[in-house]
Amino acid sequence: MGCLGNSKTEDQRNEEKVQRETNKKIEKQLQKDKQVYRATHRLLLLGAGESGKSSIVKQMRILHVNGFNAEEKKTKVQDIKNNIKEAIETIVTAMGNLSPPVELVNPENQFRIDYILNLPNYKDFEFSPEFYEHTKTLWQDEGVRACYERSNEYQLIDCAQYFLDKIDIVKQNDYTPSDQDLLRCRVLTSGIFETKFQVDKVNFHMFDVGGQRDERRKWIQCFNDVTAIIFVVASSSYNMVIREDNHTNRLQEALNLFKSIWNNRWLRTISVILFLNKQDLLAEKVNAGKSKIEDYFPEFARYTTPDDATPEVGEDPRVTRAKYFIRDEFLRISTASGDGRHYCYPHFTCAVDTENIRRVFNDCRDIIQRMHLRQYELL
């Protein structure tokens, strides 16, 4: 009779059975999630502000996530119009601030500058026909163009010329941005943005983190289980200064940042894919011959193009020398302090050129796969 007190009721046995089955399902799902997690390549996009990181993410969407639908494109119209407003405001403000100042070729346009400088400064500004007329006329003034040519002396968004040239298209009521418009559109990245995509049944998670100095403290929370870092550099920024202090050379800032990441004790086993970006703008500057690299980096005067350099078809030898000099400045850092546990893989990129990014990312996939296998000690 004493044994009867330990017997379980039918309800208790059923409850325990349900609990065991539930636990099995949870364990099975955890194992499945772990497998998916381990099979996912996590890529962290780092780099100084305005280097083109967000454009790389947009390219991944265009190439691997069916791009942007019509509704998403419509939501970017206001941002693009804001880019036009910011561009013309910045240029006409700089005309009086530069030394020596820049004069209008047609003084009758002064009232248009006064109009632009008195515009309200809020995000949802309503763009009138009057705004477009004044902006277009000013953009055609040779004095405004001359000020634009000196844009390395002040802070101007890269897409200024692109969108100012498209005013007649953007102002239309039925305007829908093209993929190229979306790639060019500049919106400050604040925080951390994740993009998920799949290439040949391989899962990728790409994390885009704001590049301005006050955003970098957020980077450390992204470092856990990263497969590789993609470090993006604005190669054309050799004659510009950063927005944060209007003093530090932008390319030097990128070099310093790269060095701090390369030597970070938490990242000693994570390899870096180096995107030497904005090659189109670098070529424009070098070919124009107005801003000489040696004026900002004196060591360039002694630099010779390496024998193994592979220039693009029809590329000016001056451009080849410039881009390889910038590449080698970064490789000097990686080779000086590398201990063989991580490597630097440089690529010349143009983030607004979809075919270029398609080709470069395809070239990088084998490298990323090897890093992933090494990450889980399978190689």
From Swiss-Prot:
| Chain residue ranges for the region called G5 motif | 349-354
User: Which is a Gene Ontology cellular component entry for this protein?
Assistant: heterotrimeric G-protein complex
- In this chain, the stretch annotated as G3 motif covers 204-213
Q: Where is the composition biased (Basic and acidic residues)?
A: 8-25
The highest taxon in the source lineage is Eukaryota
Q: Binding residues for Mg(2+), per the UniProt record?
A: 54, 189
Give the lipid-moiety residues, type N-palmitoyl glycine.
Answer: 2
Ranges for region G4 motif: 273-280
Keyword Lipoprotein belongs to the record: yes
Q: Where does GTP bind?
A: 47-55, 182-189, 208-212, 277-280, 351
The residue ranges of the G-alpha domain are: 39-379
State the oligomer form and interacting partners. Answer: Heterotrimeric G proteins are composed of 3 units; alpha, beta and gamma. The alpha chain contains the guanine nucleotide binding site.
In Swiss-Prot or TrEMBL terms, this protein is called Guanine nucleotide-binding protein G(s) subunit alpha
**Organism, scientific name:** Xenopus laevis (African clawed frog)
Encoding gene, per UniProt annotation:
gnas
